[in-house]
Regions:
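Generic enzyme active-site microenvironment
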Residues: 7-9, 77, 142
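Extended, intrinsically disordered, low-complexity segments
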Residues: 115-152
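Alpha/beta enzyme core
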Residues: 1-72, 86-97, 102, 108, ...
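Hydrophobic alpha-helical scaffolding
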Residues: 82, 100, 104, 125-132
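Glycine-rich beta-to-alpha transition loops that act as phosphate-gripper elements at the mouths
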Residues: 75-84
């Protein structure tokens, strides 16, 4: 415990291509894991997966509440946040999620803009302007969704 934050993960956050969505984090196991490891945040499996979904996932909001309570209000992390409907993200945050990973959506925001950006220059600072703006705009929307704009 050298003052370094450590995020643990309990349960398996699979990939959407594997359709692995059933190994949810057990509340009692989460409580024990946190006590034994001293992690500063815990990534939990509550219905998400990495990648793009074929249909929107349904988060187990009650499980989030239960894990949050059992772990002494430890910050909880949601992996696989890309593609989760905004209302479910809001509910997850209200239940105890404190960090959400949106990596797939960030990649697609960037790549989608690269695909439509006119290639009239080889100057990277010009070519990358719109893809970078797409990422910025996406991040701003998620910062607002999570309520983080009220604490910045």
């Amino acid at each position: 415990y050298a003052g370094v934050p450590v995020e643990g993960e309990l349960g398996h956050v699979g990939a959407t291509k594997d359709e692995v969505l059933g190994n949810y984090t057990d509340v009692a196991e989460a409580e024990r894991f946190v006590k034994e490891t001293g992690v500063s945040a815990l990534a939990v499996m509550v219905g998400t997966a990495h990648g793009r979904y074929k249909k929107a996932p349904v988060l187990d909001i009650q499980r989030i509440r239960d894990i949050r309570e059992a772990t002494g209000k430890l910050p909880l992390v949601l992996h696989g946040g890309s593609g989760v409907p905004d209302e479910q993200i809001r509910m997850a945050v209200e239940a105890g999620i404190r960090k959400v990973n949106f990596a797939t959506d960030l990649c697609y925001a960037f790549l989608d803009q690269v695909m439509v950006t006119e290639r009239t220059t080889v100057a990277l600072d010009v070519f990358m302007r719109e893809p970078i703006h797409a990422i910025r705009d996406y991040c701003i929307s998620k910062i607002r969704l999570l309520g983080a704009d009220r604490i910045l």
